[in-house]
Amino acid sequence: MRQAPGETIAEPARRIPVYGHCDVLVAGGGPAGLGAAVAAAREGADVVLLERYGHLGGLSTGGLVFWIDRMTDWQGRLVVGGIGRELLDRCGRDAVLGPPPELWGAQEKEAVAYWHIRASAHRGVVTWAPTVDPELLKCVANDLVREAGVRVLFHCWAVAAIAEDGQVRGVICESKEGRFAVLAKVTVDCTGDGDIFAAAGAEFESDVEEATIHARVNTSFRFGNVDLARYLDFRLHQPQEHATLMRQAVAAGVELRVHATPYDSVALFMTPKFSGYSAIKVADLTAVEFRSRDAMRAGLAWFRAHVPGFERAWILDTASQIGVRHSRRLVGVERVTLSRWKAGGRSPDSIGLCPGLTPEFPTLEIPYGCLVPRRLEGLLAAGRNLSCDPQAHNPLREVPECWVMGQGAGVAAALAVRQAVPPRRVPVPALQATLRQQGAIVGA
């Protein structure tokens, strides 16, 4: 293809049909969007949820990022409740791999060693960071939106904001039916990339530190027909041999890390992670898809030949959704910074919690203001496109925190509609009280 930098065409003006009106429109059905839609509907709002794929859950399901890191703090206290906890509970024990509550916060050597190789013990502490069956999680997500009365539209992509005089009134979607508009009193951008607030003219940031993990992109995959118990036993009882084997893999160009899953025959891989790519450039995203699958095939051959438990493994699936960690971040009325976090992390307008990065960090109270644009009205943003600095972004982009922010944004949107006020004018005490009624853990 011959590139054409600077060349443009004129798109003729046309009338766009209005698909419908609603109280709250949620763009994106990932963890944040699911939380927002269900929370708003449970408060009586008429909610429409738009999702470009054919399932809910976003990266936690279609992206195969079903390692839910973390639901507890370093002392073993549950810090994520509400809709996130409900989703995991409704998946059932057989579909969720993680330590029982009596071990949360444990520091005994044997417990830490056992759960460390199952990704639920870090820095010498057992945490509740479970892995979950992504297909069952999709089904449970469907149950929640249907029970709440959310109107879901799959296979349509919110591509533009409808904004007049600084007021967002809805979005324009593309679909197999063609282009249409959905109008709303409050719109919640849960696209992950801030597509709607960027299109509406909100200020945003996109700077990252290239050496950090959240500057990297990959497509996750799973191997089937694995003897996972044998592999985990080898890793637990022969740690030096395992470490040597993984160094040999890296030397051979295979940089894969095994994640345990709820099922003994399935292994998850969320590596290798590729840096130097933009999550909002199609050529870069395409390159990552090719590189990820090349790495998967090479990794399968090496693991079959060298790694205990993988002798008869085969490719089970690859993620339908690419694993993006960072793109755009809102410039909000408040901004979470690492220095603020280190200083105590308290927020009078807290909507939920995020466990500290390390045991030395306090639990962060996530401020409502980091979901509110500095200037635009009628819009909230929730998920990894929140308002924060690059250093604080890494833990805040995780699935549990997206559930938390989504639920906070959904309740706020419903209250804004009920009280006929802009989202930035929603009374914080009422917001926090309603979140607690929904089972959320608001304050540390």
Task: Identify the meaning behind each predicted range.
Residues A27, V182-G192:
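Short hydrophobic core segments
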Residues G20-C22, E177-V186:
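Core beta-strand elements of the Rossmann-like FAD/NAD(P) dinucleotide-binding domain
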Residues D189-E203:
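Flavin (primarily FAD) binding-site architecture
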Residues M1-V24:
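Extreme N-terminal leader/targeting segments of oxidoreductases
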Residues L103-T131, E135-C139, E147, D207-A382, ...:
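Mobile, glycine/GP-rich and aromatic-enriched active-site lid/loop segments adjacent to catalytic centers
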Residues I162-A181:
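Conserved beta-strand-loop-beta-strand element in the redox core of flavoprotein oxidoreductases
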